[in-house]
Amino acid sequence: MRWQGEGLLLDAKRYGETSALINVFTVSFGRRVGLVRGAFNKKNKVAIQPGNQLFLTWNSRIEESLGTFKVELIKSRYHIISEERIGLEIFNLIRVLCSIFLPERVDFDDLYHKTIMCVEGEHGIKEKLKRYVEWELQLLTSLGFGLD
């Protein structure tokens, strides 16, 4: 089994000496967790930062197994997110909520695009908070708890 696509890195945890388990939110494949071998070498170390947009290649023998990722950096957002406190707090909320509430391997295209809009760009505090509230409403709608 193999697929390729774009995704937002939510979290990376060290696994062994050189590998990492990454949690990504992808455009067409939903939230996925997989192993990146050599995650902390010179090539991948820059890409494996929360908030970065990655091109992912996922390989596995069968669909249900963990699988391995090969990653390529599309856009680095880590430095933009960590510049000011409110942006970092909003991104951390998004990471945690996606990791907890989104089931694995379920497609959430609308929420993915709203997430990118919320994380991306340099806006004032009011605009960032407005985008975050809109994102949370989209999360609730995507999970079936939308407001009328």
Predicted regions and their residues:
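Non-catalytic alpha-helical scaffolds and adjoining flexible linkers that form interface surfaces
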Residues: 1-20, 25-148
